[in-house]
Every structure is written in C-alpha cells, then in structure tokens.
C-alpha cells in the first residue's frame, strides 16, 4: 500500500475499564496476481447481529472472503492501483481465480471478458449492503448501464447491485468499505 494503515482496537481490562488491546497494522491482508496491485486490508469482521463487542483481540484471524458471514459484517480498506496497463489483458480464468481466492466466484458477473453486456471484467454482485467511502484518489463505480466517477470524500451506498471499481487515473485509489450481510430477495427499488 502507498500509505500504512494503523488499526486501533479497544476492549476492557479485568476491572471493566476501557483499554487499547491492539495498535498496529492490520493482520489480514490479501493480494491477487490476477489483479496486480489491488490490496485488501481486512480491519474487522463480525458474524452475528447484534455484533459481539467482546471476544477475540483480532476478529480477522479467520480466512478472508469477499462477503461477510451470514448476519455479519466486514470492514476493510482496499487500494485500487491504476488499471490501464493490465485490465485489457484480464482473461475469464483470471477473473474466476481472483474471485475464487475470496470464496466468491459465484459473485462474478461476466467472467473476465465481460460477456452478456457486462462492462468490466471484475463486475460482481453480492447480497450485501455496502457502504463505500473514497479516502484518496478517484475510481469509477461501474454499473450495468452507467458509471459514476467517485472522488475523495464521496460515499456510495451499494445495495446488492452488479458493479465494479475501475481506477483509470494515474494514482492509487483507496476506499473504505463496510459490507453488511443482506437480503437481496426483499425486492429491488
């Protein structure tokens, strides 16, 4: 990553006072050779609602997936490098491998060469409600029939739609995501 991420986790001591139990870089980081330069930093994960506020010092020691557990959440920061040098070379197998490594090959929409009218080889759809905050740089939010240029300070509420993130600039883009398990059968409005 271009800048280090510091994660501070609080908890309680034996007397119930608030304390810092962890202060340092994230311990769950994933990169994929099929998507060069993309770095996923998992910061925290929950697997129940309401979320447990006690428990393990590091909730990210389990395998990293794209989607949160049922009734869970994922909090992460993803850095997207400029993609102009490699995006046109992404094969269907590359896209499947990149998403398969996150346990989410089922989420891929188009499989690499964007068949079926998909606009980006990494178009995907999950049954999650995602809050995205662009921290630095800029990135296009690619949807089925439109695109939105997102810049630092912009927020997206992504509601289980087919989408991709495309950095067409010459600088990295860093986005914070909170993914919440959702119910995509509740209707589309």
Regions found by a protein language model. Name each.
Residues 1-61:
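N-terminal leader/capping segments at the start of a protein or of a new domain
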Residues 3, 14-15, 22-26, 50-54, ...:
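Glyoxalase I/VOC metalloenzyme domain signal
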Residues 8, 12-13, 17-22, 27-31, ...:
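Double-stranded beta-helix
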Residues 26, 76-126, 160-162:
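Conserved short histidine dyad/triad with adjacent acidic residue
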Residues 69-74, 138, 147-151, 160-184:
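Ligand-binding loop in jelly-roll beta-barrel domains
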Residues 117-126, 131-152:
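A short beta-strand-loop-beta hairpin characteristic of the jelly-roll/cupin
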């Amino acid at each position: 990553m271009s800048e280090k991420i510091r994660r501070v986790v609080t908890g309680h001591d034996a007397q119930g006072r608030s304390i810092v139990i962890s202060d340092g870089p994230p311990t769950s980081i994933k990169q994929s050779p099929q998507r060069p330069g993309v770095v996923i930093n998992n910061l925290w994960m929950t697997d129940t609602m309401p979320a447990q506020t006690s428990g393990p010092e590091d909730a990210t020691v389990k395998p990293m997936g794209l989607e949160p557990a049922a009734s869970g959440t994922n909090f992460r920061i993803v850095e997207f490098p400029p993609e102009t040098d490699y995006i046109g070379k992404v094969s269907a197998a590359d896209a499947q491998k990149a998403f398969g490594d996150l346990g989410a090959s089922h989420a891929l929409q188009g499989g690499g060469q964007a068949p079926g009218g998909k606009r980006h080889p990494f178009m995907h759809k999950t049954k999650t409600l995602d809050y995205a905050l662009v921290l630095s740089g800029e990135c296009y939010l690619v949807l089925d029939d439109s695109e939105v240029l997102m810049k630092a300070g912009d927020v997206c509420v992504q509601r289980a739609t087919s989408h991709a993130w495309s950095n067409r600039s010459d600088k990295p883009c860093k986005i914070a995501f909170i993914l919440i398990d959702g119910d995509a059968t509740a209707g589309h409005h």
